[in-house]
């Protein structure tokens, strides 16, 4: 009964917070400040500086890590008892989990999957696991003196076959398993239902134990009850490390590095420099027009054609269109209809950025 | 296990070292890699052999882990969990697991044999209707035109449980059961019925299970010819689909249509697990397919019934000796009722509790002796197990010190242990007796079990006259199971009373003290029956008895009074909750917090709390001084997330950045900072004691890093094209 009340209270608090936040948004007008009001440093410099950020509380963090070290033996015990370990809490757990694996799981083979990478091929992982296991079993058979069966090669087999091989009967002692460490099992490459199904089936194999970490607050939504209770069989461990997400964050964009004028002008210049001189010249006409007519919606396509043809940059509408397609693909140009219904071309950059861009091109 | 914080390791542990080495840097960008291969020690299956032998030398009696030794070992090499402990856990858990499996099998056995009988009978009738020649049977023509010959015999198994998880095992058992009876069985699940692979996928799945595992074509004629081979046709073919509702409807319909075309040539029986309602197939199958089904209904027992059966077998009948405390039982009950509702999760909870017990309590290895069936094992063998260190730990247990048992009563320990081992028997008999009585009020064993474990309960107060009047006058006792039992007792009809007495007699058969009391009730029962017969209304409930039944009423009253006295006697004499017994810690798991945190991770709440209360976790001196004010020494992401709390559901990036900057630049140095802000090259360290303003680029980089970390945790959503200057908050409150 108490629990039910607690749950209700929690839910009440949650919804109250939500509505308070919503109300706050409605009542006071949203701040109109723009990101561009900040003088943002160059992305290159931002990235360089980011790599030199010093870790705060490094002493406390390493103390925290060594506190967790005392639990390693317990974790091994839990793995041996057939559970999977799921690490969560704020901070990168990559170092912690790998340290655990290299310090305490020396008796077992350990395979690490980096789930934070944008692409992970699970079939290859399964193949590697199957090969490791067959090696292990061969060694075992040799030492126990029984004859080893000829092993087929795995690459030709399907996922189901490999999984059923990994789920083979345990011979004698139950301690013959390979430990699979999955950093960020909720990572971008593993977030789709199929990968999660495969991982769930993998974790329920008799020769496999999983140690995984999650970082996203909603990660448990990836799993249904069958996966949770029958397959992953998680034991949760709250192990906040406060360590920086160095590798995990590599594929995330920097929030301040988007949309700044210098930045877009620079990327546009890079794109333009890879185009033909004629293409560049067409773009220059467009840019100059836009600078001299700042109040208009853009340059009408026909005008651009005649201007470019006059200067012998294009010979026909077809060549102009091919240039325009190139511009549009790289988001250098957008088309709009003006009040007269004419198709107009517009460069989605500020005047300053366009001036900068023209300077860069003329160098 | 709480981190003790007293670890000899210097701060520069291998975690940071390995992190920076070039080798791992390369591994960081590989999708996967082999960290290391198993050391050769494992190949002989002697995992902790070294440790074991080491212990042998240290301890004169290696059979038991000594506390002092355990502590030293824990600090030295972390090999706290010896092979022995693992072995005992295995023994105990496999015993519990087997018990549960047996219970579930028994609860299903009636339905299973019903299904098998149905298959047998229908199969024989099909065979007798006309056997086909081989050549006819493997051809897809002539097309059968009679409607009756296209009927696919189907068993709908109602699971009465919305959660499929519990029934996975049931259907596996059913498969084994039917296979053992000679049927050809294949099991398909909703995964096989995906729209992607279509009907071909499930046909392939069927052929793989029936014919051979390497078949890769979907052709039903293969099934037909296989069926005619080597006497295969002497037995029926059964296909089990365990979660019908989750299958892709059109694919399942297609399969039914195809199979029904072949129904005479290959007599196929379809078993469909249905969890919602018996008309569920109508919702997912096409009309054509529905017409081909000839359905029979079977019903499994409900999860609550199974739950009670499991509870009875694991805790109230002699099983492993392992038990749980009142708080743990309450938690398990509320988890079952409020959160999950599946027996599977209940069993999992039990396993985690058992595991935690073994990892927390060194003496838990003594459970091994409770697992054995013999009662007097401990008296002989037990004493020799008791080394000095064990004794010390045992006499330090709270339950022992509380009961003022001291070392002077050293010889008493075996006696107490024996008592522990014997103790549950009269206790569990009483619980089961109460359960029998509670059945008339539809009480669940789970509820009774939870209440009866309460070490602070005072049951006897219910027997005071004022309480009886009270309980009759108003309905407050809803939570109070035992009070409900007592009240219901007074409303029982004579026939109900007599059936209750019979079950009590059976339950107490092995325990003469209670049994005698129960037998003493017989004369009263006979008097009631006699009175009832005289009135000619032996079965009428007391309430509806007319005034002329006063004699019967009087007898009934006497009878129920007597029964209440017997219950009072049972409660008074034997209702000693396990937690009040000395040394119960050896077999009773009590740490509900550990169980909860291992079972139910709460990333949503905990990750937010990590950020909001980072200094509590880091235990740093610099940040925890001044209450709620944000300090520049705090973790960047933590500062940023705390700032985010002040915003509405969307956060203006500019404002957020500015307030972040204000925190990082202490007020005193702000004036200085303005003049210097252009000099980007100055990258200064920020130290807790003398905070100096960092350069603009560094602040921006730190802001970016913190936003990125919040994005990784999923607490914010990044700016969209439509709203380029705002991020969105995703979580509100923890």
Curated annotation (Swiss-Prot), chain A:
Organism domain of life: Eukaryota
Localization per record: Nucleus
Gene Ontology biological-process entries: DNA replication
Nucleus is among the record's keywords: yes
Protein's job: Essential protein. Component of the origin recognition complex (ORC) that binds origins of replication. DNA-binding is ATP-dependent, however specific DNA sequences that define origins of replication have not been identified so far. ORC is required to assemble the pre-replication complex necessary to initiate DNA replication.
Listed Pfam families: RecA-like_ORC2, WHD_ORC2
Disulfide bonds: none
Protein name per UniProt: Origin of replication complex subunit 2
Reported tissue expression: Expressed in female gametophyte and embryos, and, at low levels, in trichomes, pollen and the mesophyll of leaves. Follow a cell-cycle regulation with a peak at the G1/S-phase. Mostly expressed in siliques, flowers, flower buds and leaves, and, to a lower exent, in roots and stems.
Primary location recorded for the protein, binned into one broad class: nucleus
InterPro entries found in the cross-reference section: ORC2 (IPR007220), RecA-like_ORC2 (IPR056772), WHD_ORC2 (IPR056773)
Record keyword Nucleus present: yes
Molecular function GO labels: DNA replication origin binding
One GO cellular component, as annotated: nucleus
Name of the gene: ORC2
Family: Belongs to the ORC2 family.
Reported induction: Regulated by E2F. Accumulates rapidly after cell cycle reactivation by sucrose addition following cell cycle arrest mediated by sucrose deprivation.
Subunit structure as annotated in this protein's UniProt entry: Component of the origin recognition complex (ORC) composed of at least ORC1 (ORC1A or ORC1B), ORC2, ORC3, ORC4, ORC5 and ORC6. ORC is regulated in a cell-cycle and development dependent manner. It is sequentially assembled at the exit from anaphase of mitosis and disassembled as cells enter S phase. Interacts directly with ORC1A, ORC1B, ORC3, ORC4, ORC5 and ORC6.
Swiss-Prot record, chain B:
Keyword annotations from UniProtKB, A to Z: DNA replication, DNA-binding, Nucleus
Chain residue ranges for the region called Disordered: 1-25, 532-554
Cellular compartments per GO CC: nuclear origin of replication recognition complex; origin recognition complex
Tissue-by-tissue expression: Follow a cell-cycle regulation with a peak at the G1/S-phase. Mostly expressed in siliques and flowers, and, to a lower exent, in flower buds, leaves, roots and stems.
Protein induction: Regulated by E2F. Accumulates rapidly after cell cycle reactivation by sucrose addition following cell cycle arrest mediated by sucrose deprivation.
Biased composition, class Polar residues, residue ranges: 12-24
Single Gene Ontology MF annotation: DNA binding
Main subcellular location of this protein, as a coarse class: nucleus
Keyword DNA-binding: yes
Subcellular location: Nucleus
InterPro entries: ORC3, ORC3_N, ORC_WH_C
Source organism superkingdom: Eukaryota
GO terms classed as biological process: DNA replication; lateral root development; response to sucrose
Protein task: Component of the origin recognition complex (ORC) that binds origins of replication. DNA-binding is ATP-dependent. The specific DNA sequences that define origins of replication have not been identified yet.
Subunit structure: Component of the origin recognition complex (ORC) composed of at least ORC1 (ORC1A or ORC1B), ORC2, ORC3, ORC4, ORC5 and ORC6. ORC is regulated in a cell-cycle and development dependent manner. It is sequentially assembled at the exit from anaphase of mitosis and disassembled as cells enter S phase. Interacts directly with ORC1A, ORC2, ORC4, ORC5 and ORC6.
Family: Belongs to the ORC3 family.
Name used for this protein in its record: Origin of replication complex subunit 3
Naturally occurring in which organism (per UniProt): Arabidopsis thaliana
